[in-house]
């Protein structure tokens, strides 16, 4: 029979674990609801919603003590062409990537990315973009927040891209004019579409010889702990901000499979419809993965 002290320790540990998970999910929910609120105007060009969102991210990163990769954390770029459907953007419109880092003992880097902008507005209709991609942005911001309190071997870089919906504009600009040495990147992980997840996680560009060992590690961790229903793999595709980097460094894109989220690329992609039932498990999976890489 287990001793009472042992039972008490297990109970306390379980309570602490559950409390930490609840805090992670609460942070993600609050961040998603902030980014997908009417005050952000769909994070597009209209009313400069993208700049309002970028300023929110800049303030959060500064509060966590992350260092800027560019002045005021912003790398500015301009859109090359006018679009006629959401996201409605005028050629020459200036937007920004939000770029920060946590220095480690090594100059070898692990990079997390997410696109923070969305489709903006069409007439008076707001495209809120909770799933796409306030959710991935919140997950990357949560990682930055947690890692800022820890001493790490690797340098961690956090990039929040603009212009993804108009054709990977911000990430392509960064890959062309990088603020870091891309040959020092050990792995780049892009998070996009991170609500739901009843059916697990998909890893894009998982079959590349440079990325497959990392996906193997992620899968083995999940086999041990069952953080996700499954880890699925697919070949590379130009469907998110990892793509401009795939010829320059090991880069993958992770998104959720199944579960609850609002309408894709519609005004119904709202905060209240973003299911976060699996968020804490996915967050713990990523932290466990990083801890294994650090060994």
Region spans (language model):
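Second-shell loop/turn segments in exported
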Residues: 38-48, 86-89, 124-133, 160-161, ...
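Structural recognition of the beta-strand scaffold that forms the well-ordered cores
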Residues: 33-36, 98-99, 109-113, 157-160, ...
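Active-site-adjacent substrate-binding region
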Residues: 199-295
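Bacterial Sec-dependent N-terminal signal peptides
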Residues: 1-25
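A non-catalytic alpha/beta surface segment that caps or lines the substrate-entry region
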Residues: 43-101
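Acidic/histidine-rich catalytic neighborhood of metal-dependent amide-processing enzymes
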Residues: 94-96, 120-213, 217, 238
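Extracytoplasmic/secreted proteins, especially bacterial periplasmic and envelope-associated proteins
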Residues: 27-34, 48-63, 72, 135-142, ...
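Solvent-exposed loop/turn segments at secondary-structure junctions
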Residues: 39-42, 61, 67-68, 105-106, ...
């Amino acid at each position: 029979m287990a001793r009472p002290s042992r039972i008490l320790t297990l109970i306390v540990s379980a309570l602490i674990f559950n409390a930490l998970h609840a805090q992670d999910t609460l942070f993600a929910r609050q961040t998603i609801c902030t980014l997908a609120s009417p005050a952000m105007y769909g994070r597009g060009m209209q009313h400069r919603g993208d700049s309002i969102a970028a300023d929110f991210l800049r303030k959060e990163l500064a509060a966590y003590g992350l260092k800027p990769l560019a002045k005021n954390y912003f790398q500015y770029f301009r859109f090359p062409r006018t679009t006629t459907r959401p996201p409605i953007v005028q050629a020459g419109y200036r937007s920004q990537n939000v770029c920060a880092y946590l220095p480690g003992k090594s100059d070898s880097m692990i990079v997390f990315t997410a696109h923070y902008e969305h489709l903006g507005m069409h007439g008076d209709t707001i495209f809120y973009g909770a799933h796409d991609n306030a959710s991935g942005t919140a997950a990357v911001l949560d990682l930055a927040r947690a890692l800022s309190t820890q001493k790490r071997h690797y340098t961690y870089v956090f990039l929040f891209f603009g212009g993804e919906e108009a054709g990977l504009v911000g990430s392509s600009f960064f890959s062309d004019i990088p603020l870091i040495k891309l040959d020092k990147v050990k792995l780049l992980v892009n998070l996009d579409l991170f609500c739901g997840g009843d059916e697990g996680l998909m890893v894009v560009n998982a079959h590349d010889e440079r990325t497959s060992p990392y996906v193997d590690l992620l899968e083995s961790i999940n086999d041990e702990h069952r953080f996700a229903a499954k880890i699925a793999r697919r070949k590379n595709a130009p469907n998110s901000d990892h793509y401009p980097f795939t010829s320059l460094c090991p880069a993958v894109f992770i998104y959720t499979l199944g579960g609850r989220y609002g309408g894709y690329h519609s005004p119904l992609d709202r905060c209240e419809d973003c299911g976060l039932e699996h968020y804490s498990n996915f967050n713990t999976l990523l932290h466990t993965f990083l801890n294994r890489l650090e060994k």
